Amino acid sequence: MAKLHHLGFPRIGNKRQLKFALEKFWGGELSEQQLQTSAADLRQQNWLDQQDLALDLYTVGDFSLYDQVLDMSFLVGNIPSRAKQSEQDNSLDNYFRVARGRSQPQECCAASHGQSGESQAGEMTKWFNTNYHYIVPEFDAQTTFLLNAKQLLLQIEALQKINKNVKPVIIGPVTYLWLGKEKDNSQKLTLLPELLEVYAELLALFAEKNITWVQIDEPILVLEIPKQWQEALQSSYQKLGQSKVKLLLTTYFGELKNNLKLACELPIAGLHLDAVNAPHEIDSAIDYLGTDKILSLGIINACNIWKTDLNQTLNQLLPIHQKLQDRLWLAPSSSLLHVPIDLNNEDKLDYEVKSWLAFAVQKLQELSLIGRALNDGLSSVEAAFTYNKLCIENRRQSPQVHKQDIKSKVLNITPELGQRNLAIKQREALQQSYLNLPSYPTTTIGSFPQTSDIRQLRQAKRLGDINEEQYKKSIKESIEFCINEQDQLGLDVLVHGEAERNDMVEYFGELLDGFVFTQFAWVQSYGSRCVKPPILFGDVSRPKAMTVEWSSYAQSLTEKKVKGMLTGPVTILNWSFVRDDQPLQTTCMQIALAIREEVLDLEKAGINIIQIDEAALREKLPLHRSQWQQYLNWAIAAFRLCANGVNDKTQIHTHMCYSEFNDIIAAIAQMDADVITIETSRSDMVLLDVFEAFSYPNGIGPGVYDIHSPNIPDVEQMVSLMKKAALRIPAEQLWVNPDCGLKTRRWEEVKPALLNMVAAAKKLRAS
């Protein structure tokens, strides 16, 4: 009998209950006890919802109030000293201080009276090749570890009251160290022996709780890791494999390649493979695992929202099941954290498109159906399999998906469409003469605070409570307010503020053909930040201009230059749930053609600085470096396609966030944007080290303060950061800007922060 389980379930709640509870807690409207009660209710509901799915093991430890890597840091007692403001190291105050630089608003008052209420937030970066972000663990020569498993053990006890077959999930010790960053010249692998003692202690506590199986995630096995890290995995599991619990080593997000034999031969009880992305490794894994170990196959794609082809998957599994019998386990490919919770909440979605989709609940239902087909025979689920086959075939042939005229446009793309007339230095001189900007020009990344009034306005429009004319009037009032505020703050290049946009990708998807939208298909990006990605289901085109009206109006209000604000094709692709029936490259070029039309229309309307955000350029880099160049070739080509065709005096900007780009700097230079703004403040400008060896010819704005933290940046701190930047990049190429958009901040935070930023720029000009 094949056993069924999952690697993790979404934690935010089907109506984003966790987000709202967190924000109330941070705002002082909810006590710590009330927050913990809300969290417990969410966990309980998740477990109850899974009871009808015939799972053999129930997962615990997949829930987090902010981030599972941060949870692991607190579980093993690795807490930065700057965050230890509470006597209890594992307090929520300390936890949120690491996550966001501050816990609750009263700390702001403490800080203003000279107390240490604020601290620098932990660095945040992408979780492998997903749109989830984790708080980077910090290590130094003084790092020690101390187990504090109280919260996790309480969760285990709560789940055991519902079902005794409990499987805790933890991040493996080697992956945990790999994900972290040394803050000095120490070597983090030297910390492994002490860390393993804490893990061994934790596994012993699990055994005392009558736990049989523990899921231990080591996703670095899908990377090309150095030999010493392979050896670290071997030594780690030689020790941990001696515990009284059985270890299910889990990998996800791709193939193991050279690490496959290593993983299979570790002293573990079972191995989970991503069978969606690496089905070709199954036979070798069976051979390497021997006759005693469990093989868990991730057969349901946990990173997209398309229905699984149940018949095809069953046919793939039948010979494997015959060979392994009860040594075969089935699960989604990774944690379901990366997909929305329940498709049944969507009652306004196009019926045909909806029939092609599966969210987290539906994916577990698919898993259950496949398990029943294997264990009880196809006849037990024949009706469900027949319906699934009809849906798969309908999608394959739907005229909603396939548009021949768009496919023809992509086939006719030529290299010349991605070329500017003049080289960067010639364009730079032309643009400086035309734009007449000061040294260290100041700007923002695009969005300004989304107040409750703005959100209510958009909701009123959606509900039909106001007409189009009323909506436009209010948006223009918001734009006017935003322009006036920027003028008063003394910024050099302004933006219209994006009041009309609920999300930088969703906004464009709503105006492009080939997308559909949901009401409740939220996924967690980080902490309380949730996104609702559009569903890119068909060929993409632009029916009409999308931003020209708003940017033109903003420009009419000021003598200063206003940037047009667009989202780039690679980011739209990477931050959407994308069709899987054609190459990503083809879909990306369709989007690029649509954005190119918008760029040209903005220029015709008198907008001569146009920012095309590629915040997610790096996000879909293959996990194996040997495959990077193929991705970068078409990603850079897509950007160049949409960014060119304009006059050389028109200045093209782009923005990248959460990006460690040192290893792709040559590709970024090939984008040939006139100015790039990047997120560097949390890394203390360390990201700029690459420019010591690489002569980057274009303008660059290294973010001088962290917008993800509510802390107000200090003038001298920003001056210091820019001086560090000027050691690596010629001062005449530098811009001064925040590291990301200001949408999630409040005006009372934004105004003093930008005022200080402008003051820093003026001080730099005078120095």
Curated annotation (Swiss-Prot):
<feature type="binding site">
    <location>
        <begin position="445"/>
        <end position="447"/>
    </location>
    <ligand>
        <name>L-homocysteine</name>
    </ligand>
</feature>
<keyword id="KW-0486">Methionine biosynthesis</keyword>
<dbReference type="InterPro" id="IPR013215">
    <property type="entry name" value="Cbl-indep_Met_Synth_N"/>
</dbReference>
<comment type="pathway">
    <text>Amino-acid biosynthesis; L-methionine biosynthesis via de novo pathway; L-methionine from L-homocysteine (MetE route): step 1/1.</text>
</comment>
<feature type="binding site">
    <location>
        <position position="126"/>
    </location>
    <ligand>
        <name>5-methyltetrahydropteroyltri-L-glutamate</name>
    </ligand>
</feature>
<dbReference type="GO" id="GO:0009086">
    <property type="term" value="P:methionine biosynthetic process"/>
</dbReference>
<keyword id="KW-0479">Metal-binding</keyword>
<feature type="binding site">
    <location>
        <position position="655"/>
    </location>
    <ligand>
        <name>Zn(2+)</name>
    </ligand>
</feature>
<feature type="binding site">
    <location>
        <begin position="445"/>
        <end position="447"/>
    </location>
    <ligand>
        <name>L-methionine</name>
    </ligand>
</feature>
<feature type="binding site">
    <location>
        <position position="679"/>
    </location>
    <ligand>
        <name>Zn(2+)</name>
    </ligand>
</feature>
<feature type="active site" description="Proton donor">
    <location>
        <position position="708"/>
    </location>
</feature>
<protein>
    <recommendedName>
        <fullName>5-methyltetrahydropteroyltriglutamate--homocysteine methyltransferase</fullName>
        <ecNumber>2.1.1.14</ecNumber>
    </recommendedName>
</protein>
<feature type="binding site">
    <location>
        <position position="657"/>
    </location>
    <ligand>
        <name>Zn(2+)</name>
    </ligand>
</feature>
<feature type="binding site">
    <location>
        <position position="613"/>
    </location>
    <ligand>
        <name>L-homocysteine</name>
    </ligand>
</feature>
<feature type="binding site">
    <location>
        <begin position="529"/>
        <end position="530"/>
    </location>
    <ligand>
        <name>5-methyltetrahydropteroyltri-L-glutamate</name>
    </ligand>
</feature>
<feature type="binding site">
    <location>
        <position position="613"/>
    </location>
    <ligand>
        <name>L-methionine</name>
    </ligand>
</feature>
<keyword id="KW-0489">Methyltransferase</keyword>
<dbReference type="GO" id="GO:0008270">
    <property type="term" value="F:zinc ion binding"/>
</dbReference>
<keyword id="KW-0677">Repeat</keyword>
<keyword id="KW-0862">Zinc</keyword>
<dbReference type="InterPro" id="IPR002629">
    <property type="entry name" value="Met_Synth_C/arc"/>
</dbReference>
<comment type="function">
    <text>Catalyzes the transfer of a methyl group from 5-methyltetrahydrofolate to homocysteine resulting in methionine formation.</text>
</comment>
<dbReference type="InterPro" id="IPR006276">
    <property type="entry name" value="Cobalamin-indep_Met_synthase"/>
</dbReference>
<dbReference type="GO" id="GO:0003871">
    <property type="term" value="F:5-methyltetrahydropteroyltriglutamate-homocysteine S-methyltransferase activity"/>
</dbReference>
<feature type="binding site">
    <location>
        <position position="575"/>
    </location>
    <ligand>
        <name>5-methyltetrahydropteroyltri-L-glutamate</name>
    </ligand>
</feature>
<feature type="binding site">
    <location>
        <position position="740"/>
    </location>
    <ligand>
        <name>Zn(2+)</name>
    </ligand>
</feature>
<keyword id="KW-0028">Amino-acid biosynthesis</keyword>
<dbReference type="Pfam" id="PF01717">
    <property type="entry name" value="Meth_synt_2"/>
</dbReference>
<feature type="binding site">
    <location>
        <position position="619"/>
    </location>
    <ligand>
        <name>5-methyltetrahydropteroyltri-L-glutamate</name>
    </ligand>
</feature>
<dbReference type="InterPro" id="IPR038071">
    <property type="entry name" value="UROD/MetE-like_sf"/>
</dbReference>
<feature type="binding site">
    <location>
        <position position="498"/>
    </location>
    <ligand>
        <name>L-methionine</name>
    </ligand>
</feature>
<dbReference type="GO" id="GO:0032259">
    <property type="term" value="P:methylation"/>
</dbReference>
<keyword id="KW-0808">Transferase</keyword>
<comment type="similarity">
    <text>Belongs to the vitamin-B12 independent methionine synthase family.</text>
</comment>
<feature type="binding site">
    <location>
        <position position="498"/>
    </location>
    <ligand>
        <name>L-homocysteine</name>
    </ligand>
</feature>
<dbReference type="Pfam" id="PF08267">
    <property type="entry name" value="Meth_synt_1"/>
</dbReference>
